[in-house]
Amino acid sequence: GLVAIEGGTFTMGATMESVHYEWNNNPRKVTVSSFYMDQTEVSNLDYLEYINWLSRVYKDYPEVVKNALPDTLVWRKSLSYNEPMVEIYFRHPSYRDYPVVGVSWRQANDYALWRSDRVNEKILVDAGVLSYNNNQTKDNFFTTDSYLSGLYKSNATAQAGTTDVNNNVKMEDGILLPKYRLPTEAEWEYAALGLIGNTESENIVERKVYPWNSNGLRSNQPDYMGTMV
């Protein structure tokens, strides 16, 4: 599921001296608006659902599916034996809940757009606005943009309050979700720091020394008991 990340202002970039003298990540103050982010990484099962959908809709265009497949050769490294991971990591049921790897930026962006359409399609189907079409093809599969353009006719059995007088849902009705996307570099670093709760007037004034929210050596959270770096 998605978790809300409260926005704020923080110092982005390296805050310690660069031992290699690269200085390619100089600290600067950045303001991040509130946003939502997945609580966990996209799993192999999530991405396999995407591949399965592409295989069904683009069954006559195997190159579309091929271009979406992750690069499993990323597991190969010199002086190591990772052939089992190359061969089974993505598809074996044992790794279904593991994060998908070997996905390029373009592939991840395409997945995010696909996910946006599938989520909004399910919302409309659950609300009775649309009936699910099991026979979608490359020429008639659902997209949010095509629906908002008026290319779909809503059902007469839609739930009260979900549609306008023309039985259509608009973005301003608050039912459809905005498009999923990859986080920006600032959003990713801000979320990874986990500094919510350490703000003063929307400003992050201190970074965490330890994984827990305090400068003490011990934490009351059982997950961190025994953790000491």
Segment roles from a protein language model:
Residues 1-86, 96-120:
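A short glycine-rich, aromatic-capped structural motif
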Residues 4-5, 11, 16, 86-99, ...:
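Functional-site microenvironments in short loops/helix caps that host divalent-cation chemistry
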